[in-house]
């Protein structure tokens, strides 16, 4: 059968793999090739016809490597095809050798051939081109970018392994081209030596034919399926040779070449027997030419049937492949649809996210607006607090002014009292205690005696104000005004004092003086006639006045007590004047009334401050509640 028919059985699928996996695959394939070549084909290296077969394999490998060097997927499949082609060539070596002619020279040294005498990797590595390539590779690998190598190089039967080359990719630089180049050179040299030895070596064939009857080695083809990450299997064919173990060959091969790598899944295929007649290799004389066996009609029909079956199988495989491709296409369409659906979902999600973002922006704007409103409210609150503070300060200043006025009034009152005391001490002669007469008329005037009196006494008696009693209809309960007191204090220091009494009917000082003079004349005439009666009643009046004064001293405890106070004027009649004791009592009453008034004012001020604080706190609470709402 042809090589294309044998290759038709292989069903390879291209898959993507990483560079490290690609390197491992190529290294394993090359090791299998070395193992098969040295174990099965080492004895035929002396035959010159091997060069054409090897060159054919070289051409396939070089073309595939040059065309598919940059594509890792195609490179993987091409390596598998190259391996199968190489194995097919090995299977048909016997049939091809049958057409060459005599093989006496091949069988002559069969028992003496060892792997150590054949071409080895030491010769390849020690050659000029190989050594230069290795050194260049080492220079590249020993740059600072690569990690240091800690392993020491080891040598076994002049063969370097990949660990001796400091990097697992180094073997790829010469494992195919250099090895096959050296193999060609060795084959050419062996061809010349075989042609020279064929003429002299004619008697050794009979001895080899009688002694060596080894059957041809069966080749067991195993298919290993390696699963990659994307769960697409890659077919990797390697021919593993099962041969009889001889002491020499087994020891040398085990030390020279590593054992083949094991795969995860192995599915054995039926053994294929080579179409070669063992007698054509080992039992024929050198003088008889080797004639190929002619196939019968039955065998040809069987082969045709087999080819038809294979074609049917191929068609079935193609249909299966088409179905698989359709399924794969459907899966791809479904995956694309799912991807589009996911993209739409992502777009909707992005739209929702943008909507949420806009909502957050609106919330932020609202929050900023609320914050600005709160800030304005706080500003208004600060303004109100400032206004309240101003009002409070104004009230404080007003109270301070009132206190100052009160203190000034007190000082003035003290000054007036002191001046009155001084004038009394200076002007009043030492006489007995006078009798005081009280008048209940609303407009009482001081009486003037008929006899001449000193001007000072007349002036002082005219200074005492006439205050109406509560019994009169037009009378009102009042205290002496500050204006009256100031008038009194202003008129005291003058040498000649004139009476300036303030009455409800008086409009000017002149009218007041005229009224006072007329009243004095009238009262003087009446007093002249009633002088004796008044003298008799003076003692009683004095006693009554003393009792009234004693009662009035204990009377002023509350502001309501001022209503019952009777402001009785102290008048002078007929050389009688007000006693100093009575004047002091009257001053004490006035001072007590002032103190009571000050207490009432202070209490009112305290109540006002409490009310203001309460109102301010209520206002603040109402503002805080409104801002929270």
Curated annotation (Swiss-Prot):
One of its GO terms (cellular component) is NuA4 histone acetyltransferase complex. Residues 1-11, 274-288 have a biased composition (Polar residues). One of its GO terms (biological process) is chromatin remodeling. It comes from the Eukaryota. Transmembrane segments: none annotated. Residues 247-264, 434-464, 493-554 have a biased composition (Low complexity). Residues 1-24, 62-87, 197-464, 493-560 are annotated as: Disordered. Coiled coil: none annotated. GO terms for molecular function: histone binding. Residues 294-430 have a biased composition (Basic and acidic residues). This is Putative uncharacterized protein DDB_G0271982.
């Amino acid at each position: 059968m042809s090589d294309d028919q044998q290759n038709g059985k292989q069903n390879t699928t291209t898959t993507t793999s990483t560079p490290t996996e690609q390197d491992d695959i190529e290294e394993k394939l090359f090791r299998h090739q070395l193992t098969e070549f040295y174990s099965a084909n080492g004895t035929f290296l002396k035959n010159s016809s091997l060069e054409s077969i090897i060159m054919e394999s070289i051409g396939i490998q070089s073309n595939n490597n040059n065309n598919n060097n940059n594509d890792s997927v195609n490179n993987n499949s091409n390596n598998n095809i190259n391996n199968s082609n190489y194995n097919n060539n090995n299977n048909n070596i016997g049939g091809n050798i049958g057409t060459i002619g005599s093989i006496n020279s091949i069988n002559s040294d069969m028992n003496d051939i060892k792997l150590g005498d054949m071409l080895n990797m030491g010769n390849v590595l020690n050659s000029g081109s190989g050594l230069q390539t290795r050194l260049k590779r080492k220079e590249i690998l020993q740059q600072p970018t690569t990690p240091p190598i800690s392993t020491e190089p080891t040598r076994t039967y002049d063969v370097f392994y990949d660990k001796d080359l400091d990097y697992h990719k180094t073997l790829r630089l010469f494992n195919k081209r250099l090895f096959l180049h050296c193999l060609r050179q060795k084959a050419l040299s062996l061809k010349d030596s075989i042609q020279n030895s064929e003429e002299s070596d004619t008697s050794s064939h009979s001895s080899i034919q009688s002694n060596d009857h080894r059957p041809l080695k069966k080749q067991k083809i195993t298919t290993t399926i390696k699963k990659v990450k994307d769960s697409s299997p890659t077919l990797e064919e390697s021919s593993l040779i099962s041969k009889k173990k001889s002491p020499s060959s087994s020891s040398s091969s085990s030390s020279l070449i590593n054992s083949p790598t094991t795969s995860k899944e192995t599915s054995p295929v039926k053994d294929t027997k080579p179409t070669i007649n063992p007698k054509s290799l080992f039992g024929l004389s050198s003088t008889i030419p080797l004639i190929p066996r002619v196939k019968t009609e039955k065998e040809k029909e069987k082969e045709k049937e087999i080819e038809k079956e294979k074609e049917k199988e191929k068609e079935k495989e193609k249909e299966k492949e088409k179905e698989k491709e359709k399924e794969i296409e459907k899966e791809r369409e479904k995956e694309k649809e799912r991807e589009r659906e996911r993209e739409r979902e992502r777009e909707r999600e992005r739209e929702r996210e943008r909507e949420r973002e806009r909502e957050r922006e609106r919330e932020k704007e609202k929050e900023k607006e609320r914050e600005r409103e709160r800030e304005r409210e706080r500003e208004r609150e600060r303004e109100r607090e400032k206004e309240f503070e101003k009002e409070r300060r104004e009230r404080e200043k007003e109270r301070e002014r009132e206190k100052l006025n009160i203190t000034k009034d007190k000082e003035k009152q003290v000054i007036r009292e002191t001046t009155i005391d001084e004038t009394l001490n200076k002007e009043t002669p030492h006489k007995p205690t006078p009798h005081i007469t009280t008048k209940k008329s609303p407009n009482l005037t001081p009486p003037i005696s008929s006899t001449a009196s000193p001007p000072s006494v007349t002036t002082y008696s005219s200074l005492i104000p006439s205050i109406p009693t509560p019994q009169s209809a037009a009378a009102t309960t009042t205290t002496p005004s500050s204006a009256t007191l100031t008038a009194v204090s202003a008129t005291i220091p003058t040498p000649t004092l004139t009476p300036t009494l303030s009455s409800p009917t008086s409009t000017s000082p002149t009218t007041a003086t005229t009224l006072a003079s007329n009243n004095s004349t009238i009262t003087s005439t009446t007093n002249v006639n009633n002088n004796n009666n008044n003298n008799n009643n003076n003692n009683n009046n004095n006693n009554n006045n003393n009792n009234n004064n004693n009662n009035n001293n204990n009377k002023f405890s509350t502001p309501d007590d001022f209503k019952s106070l009777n402001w009785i004027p102290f008048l002078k009649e007929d050389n009688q004047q007000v006693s100093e004791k009575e004047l002091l009592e009257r001053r004490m009453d006035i001072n007590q009334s002032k103190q009571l008034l000050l207490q009432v004012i202070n209490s009112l001020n305290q109540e006002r401050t409490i009310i203001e604080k309460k109102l301010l706190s209520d206002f603040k609470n109402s503002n805080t509640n409104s801002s929270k709402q």
